[in-house]
């Protein structure tokens, strides 16, 4: 279920404070955060966030299209290595030939 409109978007206080400080000083340094749940606000556009994915920090450069989404959406937590059809076909024994 979506968040109520009357409540407004959620963003951690410490994260919004870091962005406001960066905007005041015109600094574009990487902002490190564990807050994957924070909604990307219009103030975040143009900044790079290092979002923690459980193992390492993934750099996320925020653009206008990302506003309204969560930071965690852009830092995947799982790595998919793919299904290998060739290995399965080679390992599977075929019918016995006479």
From Swiss-Prot:
One of its GO terms (biological process) is translation. Pfam families: Ribosomal_S19. Residues 1-30, 78-98 are annotated as: Disordered. Gene3D superfamilies: 30s Ribosomal Protein S19, Chain A. GO terms for molecular function: rRNA binding; structural constituent of ribosome. Keywords: Ribonucleoprotein, Ribosomal protein, RNA-binding, rRNA-binding. Residues 9-24 have a biased composition (Basic and acidic residues). GO terms for cellular component: cytoplasm; small ribosomal subunit. Belongs to the universal ribosomal protein uS19 family. Protein S19 forms a complex with S13 that binds strongly to the 16S ribosomal RNA. This is Small ribosomal subunit protein uS19. It comes from Anaeromyxobacter dehalogenans (strain 2CP-C). The lineage of its organism: Bacteria, Pseudomonadati, Myxococcota, Myxococcia, Myxococcales. The gene is rpsS.
């Amino acid at each position: 279920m979506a968040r109520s409109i009357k409540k407004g978007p959620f963003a951690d206080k410490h994260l919004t404070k870091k962005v406001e400080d960066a905007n005041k000083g015109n600094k574009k340094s990487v902002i490190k955060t564990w807050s994957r749940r924070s909604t990307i606000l219009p103030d975040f556009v143009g900044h790079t966030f290092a979002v923690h994915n459980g193992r390492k920090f993934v750099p996320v450069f925020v653009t206008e299209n990302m506003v309204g989404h969560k930071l965690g959406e852009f830092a995947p937590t799982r790595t998919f290595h793919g299904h290998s059809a060739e290995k399965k076909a080679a390992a599977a024994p075929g019918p016995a030939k006479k």
